[in-house]
């Protein structure tokens, strides 16, 4: 960041300019307005501001130019007491704050107005979107913001405030039709959204229609990662993982029962390396499962601990 390294620590944030460190933290009598000095997450937006998530689930924007902090939303404003668990920074500069039980807050920066902030709360309480739990936000290549929630999908067009809703349930309408969505993968012509019971809904960009992909599992799909132009690796919370060919619509299932090298524990995350090989994080101390798509072999890597 402009020849500086920034570090989020349990005692404020630190800037290293190549020679010395400078610490920014709230002390008695100083001007720094951090509500908690333990900073668990830090992100940079396209305007050069740093967004900090502190231990007390509050969010602060830091301006490196003026070396000032501001709480977002501002203290006393609606949303300032929400417990935020995730900050998601979009490519266009929009920042989303995902809360524990109050939906999501969309923060807009106005660079032509001295970087003034405005925000809207998307939740069933404000009636902007019928959900209290937003799991993820994805900005597609056309600039639309997609909300993946426990009650369907929302799509907000660029420059708009009101979202289009898909697979949502409202009172007295479409009872039981709502679905939760947890993960997303975008390609040139479609966007795949992962749901429960092995369902993936593929949004066709040209027609605006959804088509259903069903995998033979009752598990919740937790992530989708491309490993080849038409092939993805798809993880579940309780039933291992799949490889799926989007062109031929065929899949291969690697479960705990049929693949002995795969620990019988939930897959927490997956990482695809430069060789398109996949590494799985699971609830198994000292163990990493490794998948080679070229050979179809899963190996169990033991880390000395």
Task: Tell me what each language-model feature is.
Residues 1-305:
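Carboxylate-rich, polar loop motifs that coordinate divalent cations or form catalytic acidic clusters
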